[in-house]
Amino acid sequence: MLVWLAEHLVKYYSGFNVFSYLTFRAIVSLLTALFISLWMGPRMIARLQKLSFGQVVRNDGPESHFSKRGTPTMGGIMILTAIVVSVLLWAYPSNPYVWCVLTVLIGYGIIGFVDDYRKVVRKDTKGLIARWKYFWMSVIALGVAFALYLAGKDTPATELVVPFFKDVMPQLGLFYILLAYFVIVGTGNAVNLTDGLDGLAIMPTVFVAGGFALVAWATGNMNFANYLHIPYLRHAGELVIVCTAIVGAGLGFLWFNTYPAQVFMGDVGSLALGGALGIIAVLLRQEFLLVIMGGVFVVETLSVILQVGSFKLRGQRIFRMAPIHHHYELKGWPEPRVIVRFWIISLMLVLIGLATLKVR
């Protein structure tokens, strides 16, 4: 929005030309989202406390979590607000990739909001009925995926980028829709599963979004895209603004979510952020890179799948509790130790993922 305004004002004052620089807008997008989160935090927490929107804790969870009962949840509202406002201010409104991300972000945020509302108001730990949750998540994911397929059919926008192989970029055809669907829905649920400890989900989200900001910049720059042997996508550059907004909003939220948390993001935050990371990976044609950089989310999800599968097939559990972060809690690890070690692993995986762009 401000970019368009600056384009009209630059003829009166050349200094407004700074708004055309992607790096400048990326920095101010991050700072804008950060300050909005920090400003909203105390007000959001006070409002949630007044409404008695407190966390519902399962009775079969770790005993250390019982003290979290009643902590304000649905703090993801301030994350989404910060991201959306920052993106609308600093990104080109005409960019279709930006609107794809905002569609998934807001759509999944609404689904998460309904889920959280049922939990905190009706005191139902299950929240929104699973089949309805997945139905609406699927509708949004398939709708966006189908639109992207029609717009980018038989172009680099629907090719599959394979790590380590610079000349292997098969055209996916209709399989693109299926792949995009699983990436968006899967990542939304993966981040949701990871959000079980104070700050555990938000920092890996920040790391992955920061990594994708660099990838988006390279993908939207023809020279760097050719140098790295990745598809050049002319709309990809504006995703830098989206990614840095996620980073800023995430850091602002972490100020209040760090151990011991004053507020939880809830499903309104985790589903939305996961879906956003998923669609960003799809738009950049970096689904494999998401698996590497988001390895913490992948392991958390696999631990649940393996736990459920093992119990149904063998009647035995692999872990003391799933997702796997609870397993380490029950082994005696203090919560801050689990959180920080997962952060370290996440940062390492993001750096490894970025390195694969050059190893081709």
From Swiss-Prot:
The UniProt keyword set, sorted, is:
Cell cycle, Cell division, Cell inner membrane, Cell membrane, Cell shape, Cell wall biogenesis/degradation, Magnesium, Membrane, Metal-binding, Peptidoglycan synthesis, Transferase, Transmembrane, Transmembrane helix
Q: Does the keyword Membrane apply?
A: yes
Q: Name one Pfam family in it.
A: MraY_sig1
Pathway it works in? Cell wall biogenesis; peptidoglycan biosynthesis
A Gene Ontology annotation in the biological process aspect, one of them, is: regulation of cell shape
Q: Spell out the PROSITE patterns in the cross-references.
A: MRAY_1, MRAY_2
Task: Extract the GO molecular function terms from the UniProt entry.
Answer: metal ion binding; phospho-N-acetylmuramoyl-pentapeptide-transferase activity; UDP-N-acetylmuramoyl-L-alanyl-D-glutamyl-meso-2,6-diaminopimelyl-D-alanyl-D-alanine:undecaprenyl-phosphate transferase activity
What EC number(s) has UniProt assigned to this enzyme?
2.7.8.13
Please indicate which superkingdom the organism of origin belongs to: Bacteria
Question: Single GO cellular component annotation?
Answer: plasma membrane
As its record notes, the protein acts as a catalyst of: UDP-N-acetyl-alpha-D-muramoyl-L-alanyl-gamma-D-glutamyl-meso-2,6-diaminopimeloyl-D-alanyl-D-alanine + di-trans,octa-cis-undecaprenyl phosphate = di-trans,octa-cis-undecaprenyl diphospho-N-acetyl-alpha-D-muramoyl-L-alanyl-D-glutamyl-meso-2,6-diaminopimeloyl-D-alanyl-D-alanine + UMP
Can the keyword Cell wall biogenesis/degradation be found in this entry's annotation?
A: yes
List where the protein spans the membrane. 26-46, 72-92, 94-114, 132-152, 168-188, 199-219, 236-256, 263-283, 288-308, 338-358
Q: Which family does it belong to?
A: Belongs to the glycosyltransferase 4 family. MraY subfamily.
What does this chain do?
A: Catalyzes the initial step of the lipid cycle reactions in the biosynthesis of the cell wall peptidoglycan: transfers peptidoglycan precursor phospho-MurNAc-pentapeptide from UDP-MurNAc-pentapeptide onto the lipid carrier undecaprenyl phosphate, yielding undecaprenyl-pyrophosphoryl-MurNAc-pentapeptide, known as lipid I.
Give the protein name, as stated in the record. Phospho-N-acetylmuramoyl-pentapeptide-transferase
From what organism does this protein derive?
Answer: Enterobacter sp. (strain 638)
Gene giving rise to this polypeptide: mraY
